[in-house]
């Protein structure tokens, strides 16, 4: 028998075109089962009704979950340990919120043995044009193989050209590669990459926010790109024209606070024009895998052995500082209490709290959060980083 909570999540993943901030807010407020019931009965606000009205009577959740289980997959929700909390925390930042669709996914449909929570802290996106040149495919393969050899996961979109070259090289080097799809996991796209996507699902991880049967479309590719950027620490554009999906992924990476990098190419090549534009606007120049590894390193490697608390506070975002200042000087506080003190919604404090924990500035015990002082903070930061890498 299918778990009612899983069935509710599966129903909700189909009822609105993702990402739907209003639907996510309802789920945070009342939980997935109650949210699904309200949506199904049409007992939601006008704004959410506009997003769900056309599909609320479509319930394929049981069939969707059975298909997922037959394929050996899993539904990853924000309640699961595998949910990449730190990676998706970036969607609470101002850069993401300023962009259309700048929201965390509701759920993820995933196939493959690699866990997202373990992969994302040490991953790099290698992306580029479908109409790649021999030069571009050679460089993409060389970079991906080098990353795989250095235990860095390679994230891409499964497309022809640069994406495919990166995925194949990572697999051939016995590394981990991640494919983020713009449609249901049961619709291999492009069809010519069916075998490649199958290999990724066997040895890495393939995931999508779209339920089975949903076909890729142009707007879904652009929406998907935010997840390619989110689950990587850096986005490297190998080849791209002036108007390309890879440039869109780079824009998402910048909005999410990730490192944006590009590979230079011949000045006469239109396939490198987008890369040269990125480089002119401050992207890091990449020519070898070691350049990317410097951007990606383990979280625990980003700080010195003895970080100064003052310096750590200096680099906090506005939301992270609000949450830090809402923590009590003595004792501990619940998520709801921190939300009240910071002026943020409960869901908006989760990402900043994860950042504070990794930075050794806060810790959670028995569901309550407290400030950490310098000595304890260093030990806690190492423990938090160890759980993430």
Curated annotation (Swiss-Prot):
Per its UniProt record, what InterPro entries does this chain match? DprA, DprA_WH, WH-like_DNA-bd_sf
What conditions trigger expression of this protein?
Induced when cells are grown in human macrophages (THP-1 macrophage cell line).
Biological process annotations from GO: DNA-mediated transformation
Role, per record:
May help load RecA onto ssDNA.
What family is this protein classified in?
Answer: Belongs to the DprA/Smf family.
Q: What is this protein called?
A: Putative DNA processing protein DprA
Native species: Mycobacterium tuberculosis (strain ATCC 25618 / H37Rv)
């Amino acid at each position: 028998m299918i778990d009612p909570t899983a069935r509710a999540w599966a129903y909700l993943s189909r009822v609105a075109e993702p990402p739907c901030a209003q639907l996510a807010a309802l789920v945070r407020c009342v939980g997935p089962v109650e949210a699904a019931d309200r949506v199904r009965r049409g007992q939601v606000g006008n704004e959410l009704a506009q997003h769900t009205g056309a599909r609320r009577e479509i319930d394929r959740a049981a069939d969707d979950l059975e298909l997922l289980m037959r394929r050996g997959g899993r539904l990853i929700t924000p309640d699961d340990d595998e949910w990449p909390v730190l990676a998706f925390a970036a969607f609470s930042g101002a850069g993401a919120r300023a962009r259309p669709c700048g929201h965390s996914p509701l759920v993820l449909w995933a196939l493959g043995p690699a866990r997202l929570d373990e992969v994302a802290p040490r991953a790099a996106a290698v992306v580029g044009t479908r109409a790649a040149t021999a030069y571009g495919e050679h460089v993409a393969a060389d970079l991906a193989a080098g990353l795989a050899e250095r235990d860095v996961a390679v994230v891409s979109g499964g497309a022809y050209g640069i994406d495919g070259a990166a995925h194949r090289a990572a697999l051939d080097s016995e590394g981990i590669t991640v494919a983020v799809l713009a449609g249901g996991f049961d619709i291999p796209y492009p069809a010519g990459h069916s075998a490649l996507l199958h290999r990724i699902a066997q040895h890495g991880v393939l995931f999508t926010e779209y339920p089975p049967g949903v076909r890729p479309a142009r707007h879904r590719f652009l929406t998907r790109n935010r997840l390619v950027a989110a689950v990587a620490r850096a986005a490297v554009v190998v080849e791209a024209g002036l108007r390309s999906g890879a440039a869109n992924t780079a824009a998402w990476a910048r909005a999410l606070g990730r490192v944006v990098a590009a590979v230079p190419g011949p000045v006469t090549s239109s396939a490198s024009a987008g890369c040269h534009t990125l480089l002119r606007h401050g992207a890091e120049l990449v020519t070898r895998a070691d350049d990317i590894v410097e951007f990606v390193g383990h979280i625990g490697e980003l700080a010195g052995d003895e970080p100064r608390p003052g310096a750590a506070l200096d680099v906090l975002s506005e939301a992270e500082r609000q949450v830090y200042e809402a923590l009590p000087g003595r004792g501990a506080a619940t998520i709801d209490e921190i939300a009240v003190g910071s002026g943020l919604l409960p869901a908006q404090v989760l990402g900043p709290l994860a950042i504070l924990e990794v930075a050794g500035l806060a810790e959670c015990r028995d569901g309550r959060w407290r400030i950490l002082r310098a000595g304890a903070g260093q030990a806690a930061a190492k423990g938090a980083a160890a759980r993430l890498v």
